[in-house]
Swiss-Prot record:
Organism: Cerastium glomeratum
Name recorded for this polypeptide: Ribulose bisphosphate carboxylase large chain
UniProtKB keywords: Acetylation, Calvin cycle, Carbon dioxide fixation, Chloroplast, Disulfide bond, Lyase, Magnesium, Metal-binding, Methylation, Monooxygenase, Oxidoreductase, Photorespiration, Photosynthesis, Plastid
Top-level class of the enzyme under EC nomenclature: lyase
Job description of the protein: RuBisCO catalyzes two reactions: the carboxylation of D-ribulose 1,5-bisphosphate, the primary event in carbon dioxide fixation, as well as the oxidative fragmentation of the pentose substrate in the photorespiration process. Both reactions occur simultaneously and in competition at the same active site.
Length: 475
């Protein structure tokens, strides 16, 4: 063992401050299969060498502090410390580096996303030696993954519950998001489900406000679901938002949803917190409820390119914590999402195994072993003209969610749902016949308009609506 990294009591205690790189920068280290690996985008302060910056990240997110302490001699830091084992410059950026850090598995509590994040993205992000710091990706070892339950049910179980195969699922967020009474809200849910949608959704803002208390909303939405099911012969659902001010209240709402016999509830997992989310996911698995996850507040954390945490890390954390759906951007709608980056974390949500692919922002090969997959939800500023692109980009295992693109139909909610269902069925049929959705998408939609006046009206309303802004988050 190098004297530079010797930290046992035999060395003796020497008070003072020493460079982090003497202990925590170990380029000779060979990572273990049980290590949690992190890729940080590090922007050091002027005059701080990248080796010192990377070592500081490893130290402050594991066993280190700003000065030598005598209690270092009471343990083996070489067993427990994080190690910065590789540094590479970021192409096209001045004084910015990707620093790779390995963490021993014993640093983390089993089955706790909360504890994992408290260590890896805790105080280190306020460290003065760094101008900016962003966690780009994590490699979660199989040994740690197996301590988590993961999604309550997963993609295949959900399809079996709904008896729906071979196409994306269709949803709609009820608008206006705030202000409707429970009865009028339930009416909108019924009209959308009757028109052909598989799901409707509470907006993330909807909890239990004075204009619509949660219990009233749950009752009217359950009535809407059962009425639509009886009339269409299809299984329907509404994402009843169980997010609340306390975990106890959240579980109480989930219990009431189960008593009503509805298939799915919802949680805002970032604002609600990972501890609450994991608790709700466990309840949902034990009681046969699907769990829809909204990512409200994610852009506060992930939108800045140089500081924060990339959404692919939040997506991996959600797959560990538990959720059957999660919002994942659209590529083509009103919300941020560059195509290759979005498809990278969509695959991380759905697939059992993903290879390292830096062109899609994937820094590590990741195995999920037996952890169920999560359905990505495309939502935000999408309408019928986007249907071919969405079908081609996201494939069958996805939820395509049209809020304004359903409720904004000139003829009303049910015709809006009809238009979306017809557009989806036309795109799926065309794809199955071997047609190129990317090249022939508009033609396919126009052909379907000939036998669907609802779709024709929707196409006329949204024919010139585009959201063309450059993505902030690029490779």
């Amino acid at each position: 063992m190098s004297p530079q990294t010797e930290t046992k009591s035999s060395v003796g205690f020497k008070a003072g401050v020493k460079d982090y790189k003497l202990t925590y920068y170990t380029p000779e280290y060979e990572t273990l299969d049980t290590d949690i690996l992190a890729a940080f985008r590090v922007t050091p302060q002027p005059g701080v060498p990248p080796e010192e910056a990377g070592a500081a990240v490893a130290a402050e997110s594991s066993t280190g502090t700003w000065t030598t302490v005598w209690t270092d001699g009471l343990t083996s830091l070489d067993r427990y410390k994080g190690r910065c084992y590789h540094i590479e410059p970021v192409a096209g950026e001045e004084n910015q580096y990707i620093c790779y850090v390995a963490y021993p598995l014993d640093l983390f509590e089993e089955g706790s996303v909360t504890n994992m994040f408290t260590s890896i993205v805790g105080n280190v992000f306020g460290f003065k030696a760094l101008r900016a710091l962003r966690l780009e990706d994590l490699r979660v070892p199989v040994a740690y993954i197996k301590t988590f339950q993961g999604p309550p049910h997963g993609i295949q179980v959900e399809r079996d519950k709904l008896n729906k195969y071979g196409r994306p699922l269709l949803g709609c967020t009820i608008k206006p998001k705030l202000g409707l009474s429970a009865k009028n809200y339930g009416r909108a849910v019924y009209e959308c489900l009757r028109g052909g949608l598989d799901f409707t959704k509470d907006d993330e803002n909807v909890n239990s406000q004075p204009f619509m208390r949660w219990r009233d909303r749950f009752l009217f939405c359950a009535e809407a679901i059962y009425k639509a099911q009886a009339e269409t012969g299809e299984i329907k659902g509404h994402y009843l938002n169980a997010t609340a001010g306390t975990c106890e209240e959240m579980i109480k709402r989930a219990v009431f949803a189960r008593e009503l016999g509805v298939p799915i509830v919802m949680h805002d997992y970032i604002t609600g917190g990972f501890t609450a989310n994991t608790s709700l996911a466990h309840y949902c698995r034990d009681n046969g409820l699907l769990l829809h996850i909204h990512r409200a507040m994610h852009a506060v954390i992930d939108r800045q390119k140089n500081h924060g945490m990339h959404f692919r890390v939040l997506a991996k954390a959600l797959r560990l914590s538990g959720g059957d759906h999660i919002h994942a951007g659209t590529v083509v709608g009103k919300l941020e999402g560059e195509r290759e980056i979005t498809l990278g974390f969509v695959d991380l949500l759905r697939d059992d195994f993903t290879e390292k692919d830096r062109s899609r922002g994937i820094y590590f090969t990741q195995s999920w072993v037996s952890t169920p997959g999560v359905l990505p939800v495309a939502s935000g500023g999408i309408h019928v003209w986007h249907m071919p692109a969405l079908t081609e980009i996201f494939g069958d295992d996805s939820v395509l969610q049209f809020g304004g693109g359903t409720l904004g139909h000139p003829w009303g909610n049910a015709p809006g749902a009809v238009a979306n269902r017809v557009a989806l069925e036309a795109c799926v049929q065309a794809r199955n016949e071997g047609r190129d959705l990317a090249r022939e998408g508009n033609t396919i939609i126009r052909e379907a308009c000939k036998w669907s006046p609802e779709l024709a009206a929707a196409c006329e309303v949204w024919k010139e609506i585009k959201f063309e802004f450059q993505a902030m988050d690029t490779i």
